[in-house]
From Swiss-Prot:
<dbReference type="InterPro" id="IPR011332">
    <property type="entry name" value="Ribosomal_zn-bd"/>
</dbReference>
<keyword id="KW-0687">Ribonucleoprotein</keyword>
<dbReference type="GO" id="GO:0006412">
    <property type="term" value="P:translation"/>
</dbReference>
<dbReference type="InterPro" id="IPR001705">
    <property type="entry name" value="Ribosomal_bL33"/>
</dbReference>
<dbReference type="GO" id="GO:0005840">
    <property type="term" value="C:ribosome"/>
</dbReference>
<dbReference type="GO" id="GO:0003735">
    <property type="term" value="F:structural constituent of ribosome"/>
</dbReference>
<comment type="similarity">
    <text>Belongs to the bacterial ribosomal protein bL33 family.</text>
</comment>
<dbReference type="GO" id="GO:0005737">
    <property type="term" value="C:cytoplasm"/>
</dbReference>
<dbReference type="InterPro" id="IPR038584">
    <property type="entry name" value="Ribosomal_bL33_sf"/>
</dbReference>
<keyword id="KW-0689">Ribosomal protein</keyword>
<dbReference type="GO" id="GO:1990904">
    <property type="term" value="C:ribonucleoprotein complex"/>
</dbReference>
<dbReference type="Pfam" id="PF00471">
    <property type="entry name" value="Ribosomal_L33"/>
</dbReference>
<protein>
    <recommendedName>
        <fullName>Large ribosomal subunit protein bL33B</fullName>
    </recommendedName>
</protein>
């Protein structure tokens, strides 16, 4: 099965800063610490669908 593009949104400000290819069969949401340009620091980013 092909990978789907999902957006990673900052949990602090809600800005969608990154897009990644993710396996659609995965049931839990992807959560990664990434840099947010709007917050100007590293924050937790979670998958949006």
């Amino acid at each position: 099965m092909s990978q789907k593009k999902v957006a990673l949104a900052c949990t602090v400000c809600g800005s969608r800063n990154y897009t990644v290819a993710a396996n659609p069969q995965r049931t839990d949401r992807l959560e990664v610490n990434k840099y947010c340009k709007r917050c100007n620091k590293h924050t937790l980013h979670s998958e949006t669908r």
